[in-house]
From Swiss-Prot:
UniProt gene name: ileS
Residues given in the record as Zn(2+) binding sites: 888, 891, 908, 911
Function, in words: Catalyzes the attachment of isoleucine to tRNA(Ile). As IleRS can inadvertently accommodate and process structurally similar amino acids such as valine, to avoid such errors it has two additional distinct tRNA(Ile)-dependent editing activities. One activity is designated as 'pretransfer' editing and involves the hydrolysis of activated Val-AMP. The other activity is designated 'posttransfer' editing and involves deacylation of mischarged Val-tRNA(Ile).
Short sequence motif named 'KMSKS' region, residue ranges: 595-599
Binding site for L-isoleucyl-5'-AMP: 554
Keyword Zinc recorded: yes
Oligomer status and interactors: Monomer.
GO terms, biological process: isoleucyl-tRNA aminoacylation
Cellular component GO terms, alphabetical: cytosol
Motif ('HIGH' region): 57-67
Cofactor-binding details, from the entry: Binds 1 zinc ion per subunit.
Cofactor(s) essential for the protein: Zn(2+)
UniProt note: domains: IleRS has two distinct active sites: one for aminoacylation and one for editing. The misactivated valine is translocated from the active site to the editing site, which sterically excludes the correctly activated isoleucine. The single editing site contains two valyl binding pockets, one specific for each substrate (Val-AMP or Val-tRNA(Ile)).
Organism, scientific name: Streptococcus mutans serotype c (strain ATCC 700610 / UA159)
Protein name: Isoleucine--tRNA ligase
Taxonomic lineage from the root: Bacteria, Bacillati, Bacillota, Bacilli, Lactobacillales
Length: 930
């Protein structure tokens, strides 16, 4: 027979090469056929519930890597909770209304105003559902488990009805009102926008310094005085109706030597402004507090028929400009607020498409608002003192990527101010990951204005508001409940298919309509009201869910989006937050830390990653990054993650291969009967179990990743498995030491597979298929291991921790010997340990084959004084010489007993004894020659 046939060389069909791109879809098909998600829910039916509510992605296009980060993170949490004693259903959702879908149809040549509205809305609906199907397949390809056949979709009639009921409850409490306040207006979308629908970019703008002449100085200023104003939006001068000063700011009247006019500016800015305007030796004639200037009257710079009132406002600062700002109540929130206080007219001179209207004056009418600068300069004439280009942050429509303006238009609002404190109180009760999220959301709610909820579009949920003949808005509970029931039965499209009187409850009357005539609102709801109602449309209506949710998890942009809108509607209707905890994640950037974009060519597609590396690599990447801040990804980074995956896989493959002849019901050794080193490894592993379980409960995936990688590479590969072959390969199959080590192998293999399942479900399932003694058909149906406590574990850990330090010192001695050409491999070494009493006691306490642990052929422990050439440490020294004897062909150790026998001359006595006791045919026939 061959010598290697006497070895227990681990064999397994578990492949080294994962082949993930091909294997993952096969596993996913098995899971679908076996209905694993439903079985897990059945197993946990009577367990405590955990509800992670899915924030709905927008149904348009394939998923991007940000979607992957989000959905994989949720999947890791749901899987870990499901395996840890919780009923944790996952209902994926989609946001399906809104402008992007209208834009897609427009690009396809669909002209909304030229076809029947019901037909147009059906086209929107069909497109949205096609995108839901596309994204559903993308998410399933990532291994995300959930009730994919029963998702929630915001265009479904039952969901739309739930949304109307939220609106109705808010209206019933007086939180819905109509007003003409300035709102973010997107001329490119022809619609109002919510705060969550804007993004900021740095742009260059031309700012102007100009002057208004005083008409009535109220005995404070002379009529030959000019008040100097600064603006960054020249087009709004067409609607300017006042000037605002700071009440506590000091202002000075100055007379430059080179100008006949007198000017008023902020005292603190005089020096800077004099230089900018080239004023020669400006003489200060008077000083006034802003409060003294209240209600002084000035003349509009080019329209003598328009008077502009000087007002006081706390929003005026000395950061830039002149300390005085012009005020156009139709084009700014601060302008509007101070204008209302002083009774100014709200004038809007720009239409919905950004075109200057007739009331802007004949010189401006028909021009695009952003192109009027030359006309403004011409109209200002010698009242224009200076202009300069500045770079500043400016709001853009997040969908069209075009700049927006503030514009006062009649809109429907949801009040926040009426119950703001209630919202803030609820935020204090929510747990945030990371903790700074609480402050961020708190400040956003504290500082935000009321919510403009109306949109001038078609594809969305109609505002269920009627108007009486006298213009009175009707949104009583009776009416909104009736509309909700109609929507639930027919869908919201019925709003457009029926006349107002046919939508109202039968026999409905109103004192404002003596003739029984009614009209209906044509605006739709902000899509953030759609998704912000999901706590009612999903959590509150599905039998398998509950409200409030345990967790909302989304990107950090959702503090002004879904976290925000959901909180407002939930507190408005029910008085409490829709979530107990909020977890936010940073954005996904490319490998250089730059934003991904098609133009840069740096987009990483999850589908491409799945094809090249497999979804497991993307999932492992998610676990490896700190999502509290922005994260980076590139194919190079994923390649590094793939290498880490390979190390984990091959380490676990070694454990599989070396437990194929191990039956835990027959061969398992009790803890108290294990060798000390085996006890140590089990204790170390259970520390890992504890760390991982705690990290899962805190959604701390990176800690899990680091802990697993460290255990696999340091504790297993670099130590325990490094000397394991000397036991599991060399000793007899049923040798006690081998069974002891296999006990540890198997315990680690089974439980680390369970621990990794939430992150690497495909790989874990593949490993599980080789564990024939485990009762669950799929590892996803197993339970997470719980950390065990062992007798004397602290003492064992202390002892082995001391040995690991000694081992590091010994390896330095072996490395020096290797560099000096005394040895090649460590098995060629005879290591002498010059031990102090403390070290000798330690080595005795280990009760182990120290030479085997250090992977040397021969070891001597002595308390003699170390020679001069020894490597000396504080309480121990080492010397290394080449081992004496010959290499054993079987165990590869150098041993002086090799060649001592008349037969089996190439192996040592220890190996010979094993062969003679277990392979009698080798004794009779000898070994085949190499």
């Amino acid at each position: 027979m061959k010598l290697k046939e006497t070895l227990n060389l681990g064999k397994t069909a578990f492949p080294m090469r994962a082949g993930l791109p091909n294997k993952e879809p096969q596993w996913q098909k098995q899971w679908d056929e076996a209905n694993i998600y439903a079985k897990r829910q059945e197993l946990n039916a009577n367990k405590p519930a955990f509800f992670l509510h899915d924030g709905p992605p927008y149904a348009n296009g394939n998923i991007h890597v940000g979607h992957a980060l989000n959905k994989i993170s949720k999947d890791i949490i749901i899987r870990s909770k499901s395996m840890s004693g919780f009923r944790a259903p996952y209902i994926p959702g989609w946001d399906t209304h809104g402008l992007p879908i209208e834009q897609v149809l427009a690009k396809k040549g669909v002209k909304r105003k030229e076809i029947d509205l019901a037909d147009y809305l059906d086209m929107c609906r069909q497109y949205a559902l096609s995108q839901v199907d596309k994204q559903r397949q993308d998410f399933k390809r990532l291994g995300v488990s959930g009730d994919w056949e029963n998702p929630y979709i915001t265009l479904v009639p039952k969901y739309e009805a739930a949304q109307i009921r939220v609106f109705g409850a808010m209206a019933d409490k007086g939180y819905i009102y109509h007003g003409a306040k300035p709102v973010y207006w997107s001329w490119s979308s022809e619609s109002a926008l919510a705060e969550a629908e804007i993004e900021y970019h740095d742009i260059d703008s031309t700012s102007l310094y100009y002057a208004n002449r005083v008409k009535d100085g109220k005995d404070i200023l002379d009529t030959d005085t000019y008040i100097v104003v600064w603006t960054t939006t020249p087009f709004t001068i067409t609607a300017s109706r006042g000037l605002t000063v700071g009440p506590d700011i000091d202002y000075v009247v100055v007379k430059p030597a080179n100008d006949e006019r007198k000017f008023l500016v902020a005292q603190a800015l005089l020096s800077e402004l004099a230089e900018r305007f080239a004023w020669d030796n400006p003489q200060v004639l008077a000083t006034h507090k802003g409060i003294e200037l209240d209600r002084i009257v000035t003349i509009h710079p080019w329209d003598d028929n328009v008077e502009e009132l000087v007002m006081n406002g706390d929003h005026v600062t000395l950061d830039s400009g002149t300390g005085i700002v012009h005020t156009a109540p139709g084009f700014g929130e601060d302008d509007y607020n101070v204008g209302v206080k002083y009774g100014l007219d709200v004038v809007v001179t720009v239409n919905e498409r950004g075109i200057m209207m007739e009331n802007a004056g004949p010189d401006f009418e028909g021009q695009f608002y952003d192109k009027v600068l030359p006309t403004v300069k011409e109209k200002l004439g010698d009242l224009l003192l200076a202009s300069e280009v500045i770079t500043h942050s400016y709001p853009f429509d997040w969908r069209t990527k075009k700049p927006i303006i503030w514009r006062a238009v009649p809109q429907w609002f949801a009040s926040v101010s009426k119950f703001r404190q209630d919202i803030l109180d609820e935020i204090d009760k929510v747990h945030f990951y990371p903790a700074w999220g609480k402050t961020r959301l708190y400040n956003m709610i504290r500082d935000r204005g009321d919510w403009v909820i109306s949109r001038q579009r078609a594809w969305g949920v109609p505002l269920p508001i009627f108007y009486a003949e006298d213009g009175t808005a009707i949104m009583t509970k009776e009416v909104t409940d009736h509309i909700a029931n109609l929507f639930e039965e027919h869908g919201s499209v019925i709003w457009w298919q029926r006349e107002a009187k046919d939508l109202l409850p039968e026999g409905f009357t109103h004192p404002g309509s003596p003739n029984g005539e009614f009209t209906k609102e044509n605006d739709i709801m902000d899509v953030w009201f759609d998704s912000g109602s999901s706590w009612n449309g999903v959590l509150n209506t599905r039998e398998d869910l509950g409200y409030p949710a345990d967790l909302y998890l989304e990107g950090s942009d959702q503090y002004r989006g879904w976290f925000n809108s959901s909180l407002i509607t939930s507190v408005a209707v029910n008085g409490h937050a829709p979530y107990k905890s909020v977890l936010s994640q940073g954005f996904v950037l490319d490998g250089k830390g730059e934003k991904m974009s098609k133009s840069k060519g740096n987009i990483i597609s999850p589908n491409d990653v799945a094809k090249q590396y497999g979804a497991e690599i993307l999932r492992l990447w998610v676990a490896s990054v700190d999502t509290d801040s922005d994260v980076r990804v590139s194919m190079e980074i994923l390649g590094q993650v793939s290498e880490t995956y390979r190390k984990i896989r091959n380490t676990l493959r070694f454990l599989i291969a070396n437990t194929t002849d191990f039956n835990p019901y027959i061969n398992k050794i009790a803890f108290e009967d294990l060798r000390s080193v085996d006890k140590y490894m089990l204790i170390k592993f259970n520390q890992l179990v504890s760390v991982i379980n705690r990290a899962y409960s805190h959604y701390d995936f990176m800690t899990i990743y680091k802990a697993v990688v460290n255990f696999v590479t340091v504790d297993l590969s670099a130590f325990y498995l490094d000397f394991a072959k000397d036991v599991v390969y060399i000793e007899a199959a049923d040798d006690l030491a081998r069974r002891q080590m296999q006990t540890v192998f198997y315990e680690i293999l089974v439980n680390i597979t369970k621990l990794l399942t939430p992150i690497l479900p495909h790989t874990s399932e593949e490993i599980w298929s080789y564990l024939e003694h485990e009762e669950e058909a799929f590892v996803q149906l197993a339970e997470m291991p719980e950390a065990q406590e062992f007798a004397n574990q602290d003492e064992i850990l202390d002892t082995w921790s001391a040995f690991m330090s000694l081992r590091d010192q010994a390896q330095k001695a072996l490395e020096e010997a290797r560099n000096a050409k005394i040895i090649g491999k460590s098995l060629e070494a005879h290591l002498t340990v010059y031990a102090s009493e403390e070290v000798k006691t330690l080595l005795t306490a280990l009760d182990s084959n120290i030479a085997q642990l250090l992977i040397v052929s021969q070891l001597t422990v002595t308390q003699e004084q170390a020679p001069k050439n020894a490597l000396v440490f504080e309480d121990v020294a080492f010397s290394v010489e080449h081992a004496r004897g010959h290499v054993c062909d079987r165990c590869r150790r150098i041993d002086e007993t090799v060649k001592e026998r008349p037969y089996h001359v190439t192996i040592c006595n220890h190996c010979a004894a094993i062969v003679e006791n277990h392979f009698p045919e080798a004794v009779r026939q000898g070994f085949e020659s190499k």
